[in-house]
Amino acid sequence: MRWFLPWTLAAVTAAAASTVLATALSPAPTTMDFTPAPLEDTSSRPQFCKWPCECPPSPPRCPLGVSLITDGCECCKMCAQQLGDNCTEAAICDPHRGLYCDYSGDRPRYAIGVCAQVVGVGCVLDGVRYNNGQSFQPNCKYNCTCIDGAVGCTPLCLRVRPPRLWCPHPRRVSIPGHCCEQWVCEDDAKRPRKTAPRDTGAFDAVGEVEAWHRNCIAYTSPWSPCSTSCGLGVSTRISNVNAQCWPEQESRLCNLRPCDVDIHTLIKAGKKCLAVYQPEASMNFTLAGCISTRSYQPKYCGVCMDNRCCIPYKSKTIDVSFQCPDGLGFSRQVLWINACFCNLSCRNPNDIFADLESYPDFSEIAN
């Protein structure tokens, strides 16, 4: 029996090895049986993007106030869709106007939407809630605006410098009936001044407190940008050039360019900008149904084919008299444009922080 056991083990081992070798050398199956997963039906959802991109040779000309952007396919330039327009994955809404595409009305495809306004976050100041974009005055010294949860304020009281050296003891005091403090000159001398300022004349200083408006330092801020890029708008400034030496807001009418004239068609061949546009015929200004008593031939700022914008470079303010159908008349200050220049620093008239940016370099100017 002892010699029979090793022989049996050797035979079993050889048989197992033959089975493994036969399995390894057997041909692999040529087909596999499986059930594919059902594909998603996309026929009901249109495809708005096509690849490769097919773009027109030149970008479109957008109306004034409409952004020229890259479409949602990241292919071509397009005029952004505006509030209430239809939008898709290709035709996107104007991001510079805070618009987004609302697909809620196209369930369940969610393919075509409508451009809607993004509702910004309101603000709370001293327990009072303000809406996004709302301007308000928490007190008589500041004018504030709520901007998406943040409050930005501009002072209404001018931080003028103290009186000149001839006023030995200047101090700020509260004047009854006025919000902002004013400088007064308190002179302790009991004798006449040796050197009186030229703009006030010679007078005796007897120790009394004289109102600072008698020593008024005239200040006038620059005019703000026109409130509209085309058509009739308003610009404002602050000035204390008045009998009370009190800062007051002044306003004037402005019209940078007409909305109903396509100035792009007037740009000469080979040029990219038309800095100034002037109609050939004179016209009368109209305001609230009233007509100016005389005709004018105003100049307007033009437009560019690229990303530059044209703004007034030399201008002045004129008084225009209006006559109404009922016989009443009035006059208004109006911006009169003499020259314009075109540059890359296009700023939003509603941006209260635009003045913090640097002035455009002269290399960007194109007359």
From Swiss-Prot:
* Pfam families assigned to the protein according to its UniProt record, in alphabetical order: Cys_knot, IGFBP, TSP1_CCN, VWC
Keyword Secreted assigned to the entry: answer is yes
Q: Where is this protein localized, as stated in its record?
A: Secreted
- Domain CTCK: residue ranges: 273-347
Sorted alphabetically, the keyword list is: Cell adhesion, Disulfide bond, Glycoprotein, Proto-oncogene, Secreted, Signal, Wnt signaling pathway
Q: Does the keyword Hydrolase apply?
A: no
Q: Which residues form the signal peptide?
A: 1-22
The record's GO CC annotations read: cytosol; extracellular matrix; extracellular space
Q: Name one GO biological process term.
A: positive regulation of osteoblast differentiation
Chief location: secreted
In terms of InterPro entries, this protein maps to:
CCN, Cys_knot_C, Glyco_hormone_CN, Growth_fac_rcpt_cys_sf, IGFBP-like, IGFBP_CNN, Insulin_GF-bd_Cys-rich_CS, TSP1_CCN
Start and end of every IGFBP N-terminal domain?
A: 45-118
Residues bearing attached sugar chains per UniProt: 86, 143, 284, 343
The GO terms describing molecular function are: heparin binding; integrin binding
- Look up the domain of life of the source: Eukaryota
Give the family this protein belongs to, as stated in its UniProt record. Belongs to the CCN family.
This chain belongs to the protein called CCN family member 4
Which species is the source of this protein?
Answer: Homo sapiens
